[in-house]
Every structure is written in structure tokens, then in C-alpha cells.
């Protein structure tokens, strides 16, 4: 199938590349189907592009590359809904926001995206009883002295 993206142009994707979000994504509840687009093979950055809305895409960040201590408990009900198992482990992503400079990039630790790639289903979950922030700086001040590759 072909999808249009204002960021990536026309994309040819297979049904296996589609990730379904039965509950939508908070703020975009009508958007149920997205395609995951890695930035490159070894990058912790990727994009989640809506299959229906050309101008709707999210920057995703693989959290453990930057925040190895990031953890949360996924309840049995949620694990069951996503059909997670040892054979179908979760992939976890954070939605990122780039400010004027890449060194000011923040990620939402409070609402991770959890995906079962083998089954093609995902959900953004809202964590409770946590001190995680919705605007966690990805590059702490100590690292901000040197700009990451591709930054300004």
C-alpha cells in the first residue's frame, strides 16, 4: 500500500509494516494505523508515521540507549492486550520533541509507546505513581557542551 507523508514523501509499505493502535494515541484517538520508520539501522531514533494523515508523524527514541535505568511495570492486562510473551517481547519507545537545538531535545518518560512488532499492535501507556517527567532532557547539561552528531 502507498501512504503519503509530508516528511518522507510517498512510501510503499506492506501490511506487515503497519502497527495498529486500537485505542489510538492520546490526542490522536482516531489515528489507529502507523508505520514505524527507523532513522537508520543502528540509530536509537525512528519515526512513527500515520498511514492516514500525511502530516502526522512522531519522533521516537529508544530509551535504553540514553536512560539505561528507565523502567516501569507493564501490568498483566496490558501485556495480554498487546499479546506480549517471551516469543513476542515488547519494544519500548519514547516520543521525542526537538526544540531549537538538538541538545534541548526532550522525551516523554511518563507515556511510553509499547509495541509488539511480531503482532503489529501497540499502545501508548500513561504511567502512574511515578516521578517520570513528560519533558525529560535527553542530553543532560554535561553532555550539552558537545553537540551530538547531526546537531547544530
From Swiss-Prot:
Transmembrane segments: none annotated. Its main location: cytoplasm. It is found in: Cytoplasm. Keywords: Bacterial flagellum biogenesis, Chaperone, Cytoplasm, Translation regulation. One of its GO terms (cellular component) is cytoplasm. Pfam families: FliW (PF02623). GO terms for biological process: bacterial-type flagellum assembly; regulation of translation. InterPro entries: Flagellar_assembly_factor_FliW (IPR003775), Flagellar_assmbl_FliW_dom_sf (IPR024046). It comes from the Bacteria. Interacts with translational regulator CsrA and flagellin(s). Acts as an anti-CsrA protein, binds CsrA and prevents it from repressing translation of its target genes, one of which is flagellin. Binds to flagellin and participates in the assembly of the flagellum. PANTHER family: FLAGELLAR ASSEMBLY FACTOR FLIW. NCBIfam families: PRK13285.1-1. Belongs to the FliW family. This is Flagellar assembly factor FliW. It comes from Desulfitobacterium hafniense (strain DSM 10664 / DCB-2). The lineage of its organism: Bacteria, Bacillati, Bacillota, Clostridia, Eubacteriales. The gene is fliW.
